[in-house]
Structure formats: structure tokens, C-alpha cells
Amino acid sequence: MSANYWTSSQRLHWLLTKETLAERRKGLEDIFDPGKLQTIKALNPWHVRVYLHTLIHLLGQNLSIRQRILATAEVYLTRFHTKVPFGEINPYLVVATAVYVACKVEEHPQHIRTITSEARSLWPDYISHDPTKIAECEFYLIEELGTYLVIFHPYKSLMQISDAMARSNAQITMAPEEIQVTWSMINDSYITDLHLLNPPHIVAMACIYMTVVLRSHIMRMTMPSEAVKSRIEAFMTFFGESNVDLEQTIDCVQEMISLYVNWDTYSEKQCRVEIAKVIT
């Protein structure tokens, strides 16, 4: 197990470029017949990702599983679907399996019968009472992930960067509610491809940027506009001196904005019906 991100399998084996990711996904289309491919392409990929995110969190909530474990499961799911196209295998089974494996890797194991029972109670039409189905899917999942299962998350980077901000300039000290908002954005970032394309600290910085700069209009309700402007300038000075890649960070911000724009048009009920057409 690597002690840090820079020597980890996450960086050495699972840090992709946008071009590589697009090529992989394009290649996956070849396995489907034209009819099914047309049905899959009719799905809004953002809505599918949001739906899978809600499935993971619903199962996690029912099992009282910590957010970090669910984040690990989401990374597994995103990686898996760069190797296996959505629609080839029961997504509800893959979700349950990803959570099961993540619990073991993050040293908070759940019994396979517990996972099976809870998943079946949520999705009885798609989950068998037989726990060996998850066991079989576990081997498939781990094989497609290349057995690289240790995940580094942006949560630690968030706290490190916020501490550095406070030391650099008291004016840009993040308030507890700002930390919470940024933490929630990081949770949402797992719906995207950001964790395949960027180191954790880039994702953390992008979410901090969105909180401090893009949500500054909220601060204007309690602070004079000049004070808000001065704070943003101080943050941008910190950002410039931090040596964090600006272009990568802005790309992340744009991806997060795209997520939220598409999330506004998301209907869980409609997405569930459309996904059922693909997997039946």
C-alpha cells in the first residue's frame, strides 16, 4: 500500500487524460447491437451518473457507512465503467458490490449477507437473495480495476489547504460553514470523471475556489462588497502562490458547473424508467 498519492497506483495506473478516457468509452460501444446502443445513447449520461450516486448513498445510508467509503465505492464504479459499458451488467448489482469491496478496503467490512439483504430490500427486482452473486461480481470488479483498490481522496487536501489559507492570510480563513459547503461539493464531485483525471488536491482546490469565489454573492449579504472583493483578491494571491495548476483547477470548476446544470434537469423517476429499458 502506497503511503502517498504520488507513488500510488491511483496516479501511476488510474490517472487518465481526457483523450484516453474518451477513446476507452468510444471503444466500449462496439460490443452492443445497434438497437441497444441507440437505447443507451438516448440516456443522459449525467443523469445516469447522478442516479448511480443516489443508489450508492441510499445503500450506504441504510448501512450507516461513512462518506469516505462511499466515495471509494464511487471511484470503483467510475473506473469499472471505463472497462465495462453501462448496460452490459446489472448496475444495481455493481453498486452493491462496489460498496461491499470499498468497505473491506477501507477496513470497515460488512458481511456479504448484510449487503445482499439490504440491497435486495431496496431493489428487489434486481438483486437476488443469493449472496454468491455479489461474490462473483466482486471478482469481476476487482479484475477490471486491475486489483488497484487504494484510493486517495480530496478531503485531506481540503483541510490542508484551508489550514494553509489561514496561515497565509487571516482574511481568507474558511469559516466552518464554508468548509462544510466545500466538503459537500467534493462529495458531489464523485459523480463526475474528475477523480480519473486529476490529483486529489486539484479537486479540493477547485471546490474551495467555487466556495470562496463563485459563491461570494452570498457573503455580500453579511459583508460589505469591498470586503468581499478584498477577500477574493487575497484568495487569488494565495492561489497564484500555491503552485497549484490553474488550468487543471479551472477545468475542474467547469466540470462541476456542468454537473450542477445537468442535475437541475434530473428526474430520478424518469431516469429509473429509462435505465430499466436498458437492463431488461
UniProtKB/Swiss-Prot annotation:
Stated name of the protein: RNA polymerase II holoenzyme cyclin-like subunit
Organism field: Yarrowia lipolytica (strain CLIB 122 / E 150) (Yeast)
Keyword annotations: Activator, Cyclin, Nucleus, Repressor, Transcription, Transcription regulation
Compartment(s): Nucleus
GO biological process, one term: positive regulation of transcription by galactose
Function: Component of the SRB8-11 complex. The SRB8-11 complex is a regulatory module of the Mediator complex which is itself involved in regulation of basal and activated RNA polymerase II-dependent transcription. The SRB8-11 complex may be involved in the transcriptional repression of a subset of genes regulated by Mediator. It may inhibit the association of the Mediator complex with RNA polymerase II to form the holoenzyme complex. The SRB8-11 complex phosphorylates the C-terminal domain (CTD) of the largest subunit of RNA polymerase II.
CDD domains in alphabetical order: CYCLIN_CCNC_rpt1 (cd20513), CYCLIN_SpCG1C_ScCTK2-like_rpt2 (cd20546)
Subunit structure: Component of the SRB8-11 complex, a regulatory module of the Mediator complex.
Domain Cyclin N-terminal: 23-150
Coiled-coil blocks: none
Keyword Cell membrane included in the entry's annotation: no
Entry-linked InterPro entries: Cyclin-like_dom, Cyclin-like_sf, Cyclin/Ssn8, Cyclin_N
Entry's family note: Belongs to the cyclin family. Cyclin C subfamily.
Signal peptide per UniProt: none
GO cellular component, one term: nucleus
The gene coding this protein: SSN8
Pfam (any one): Cyclin_N
Single GO molecular function: cyclin-dependent protein serine/threonine kinase regulator activity
Keyword set includes Transcription: yes
